[in-house]
Amino acid sequence: MFFPVVFFIPFVLGAPTQKALEKILVDNNPDSVTNREKIRGIIDKAFENRVPRVQGRQGVAPPVTFAALNYGPKNNQTKKFEELNQDINEYTFESDIMLNEKQAKHIATAIENGNYRSKRQAIVDTTNFWSVSVPIFYQFDTKLSATNIANVRKAIQFWNDNSCLSFKEDNNAKNRLFLSSAGGCWSYVGKQVDMPYQMVSVGPNCDTFGTATHELMHAIGFWHQQSRADRDNYVYVDFSNIIPSQAYNFQKMAVDQAQLLNLPYDYGSVMQYYPYAFAVDSSKYTILAKENGFQNSMGQREAPAFSDIIGVNKLYNCTSQCKIQMKCSNCGITDSRNCNQCKCPRYFTGASCDSLPSGTAPNCNGAVLQATSSWETFDAKAGDPSSFSSSTDNSTNCYWHIKAPEGQQIEFKMTKTPLAAICMQECPWQSIEVNLGKFDLFGMITCCDTILNQVFTSELNMIALRGIIRYNQLTFSIQYRAVPSSKPASTNACLNQ
């Protein structure tokens, strides 16, 4: 049975509430207790009013085909920011977002009315947009360590290099980002024009590259991937395993609160929730991918996906910086920082995205493999077999392409791998990313031998593989062949074009 009271938090500052506010409203934060309480009340009241409409949704078991997927034991080695933010969850939306009053009211209206109709994932209020002609100014909290600052600088540089937005350090500029060591990992969404500066909390445990780029993407103007109105077509949200008082964190975004970018859903977006977020039983998923093979892609914090880069470039119309658009292969886009070259998905390099990256892993035997009508076999390897040190934050890569003649597709399977010994959810040590041709989206991540001898078919006439190595050496064997295409000749696998 579902009880309405779980969504209402009394406005009395007890010890947990006081602790949460102390973490958020540190000395430098221009926000206030009054404002945070007001915004919390707006969301709480909306869910209190909506309760009769959601009865019956709780406790529904996920379809057996989704629940039975085997991705190995859960990875409990690193804490996710959904866990790091437990102490402040009552004042955040979707775990790491600080809403302003206008955003809270829009979301509250959607909560009460069930108003979802579009594929939206970025801000629509132009007052929350940053200018492409003026830098986004930022300042580092003096409480951040040199290591914290160095890590966050890499994330800032990433968005500077991969969009038409520019960033500049200035401790006195108006409307600057204040990169803080406040408790937890969080940010406001978009530019907060009513604040002299806005905080982005990226202190210890929140300064990894993936998490820092995630929080900066909020500040740039993006919501979470699973907030999209069309998310139920791609993921199953198991409300029966979600802490009732945290169910509001799975709210789909209001149609008038987010920008329509016509982007496909990407399981590997850096803005996608961790699949155990807010679980009652932390050994069971709260979010399950409906597409086979993509469960391990969700919640990745290695780096932004190429679709995230495309999203930021679309939101700020970065293509307008170039008078002539490049003809890019393999889902690449014109680089707004250099209009004479393409910006490529990670599986490709070169001025027009048609070359194989050299890879960063030692002993990488990356290659372009030509498929014929007969099954061919290839033994792949990358990494140092004598290395037994590991880092889950830094990985090396090796790439392989499989190509068939134009007008044909590729059948592909993995036939041999020692992955059983390292099979674990999220694949923290070694993994293989398989992209069947939607190169502007993140691929399937696997590190378990359950994938062996499953036959996959490419979208068109190319498959890209990426070996991800954080420990020792990755080895695996594959088989592949070319087959007649079942798709029209005009098919374009690039979903963003």
Curated annotation (Swiss-Prot):
Domain Peptidase M12A stretches: 121-319
Principal localisation: secreted
Class of enzymatic activity (EC top level): hydrolase
InterPro entries in the cross-refs: Astacin-like_dom (IPR034035), CUB_dom (IPR000859), MetalloPept_cat_dom_sf (IPR024079), Metallopeptidase_nem (IPR017050), Peptidase_M12A (IPR001506), Peptidase_Metallo (IPR006026), Sperma_CUB_dom_sf (IPR035914)
Disulfide-bond pairs as recorded: 164-318, 185-206, 328-339, 331-342, 344-353, 364-398, 427-447
Domain of life: Eukaryota
CDD domains named in the record: ZnMc_astacin_like (cd04280)
Residues annotated as binding Zn(2+): 214, 218, 224
Ranges for domain CUB: 364-483
GO biological process: molting cycle, collagen and cuticulin-based cuticle; proteolysis
Enzyme Commission designation: 3.4.24.-
UniProtKB keywords: Cleavage on pair of basic residues, Disulfide bond, EGF-like domain, Glycoprotein, Hydrolase, Metal-binding, Metalloprotease, Protease, Secreted, Signal, Zinc, Zymogen
Keyword set includes DNA-binding: no
Function: Metalloprotease.
UniProt protein name: Zinc metalloproteinase nas-28
Gene: nas-28
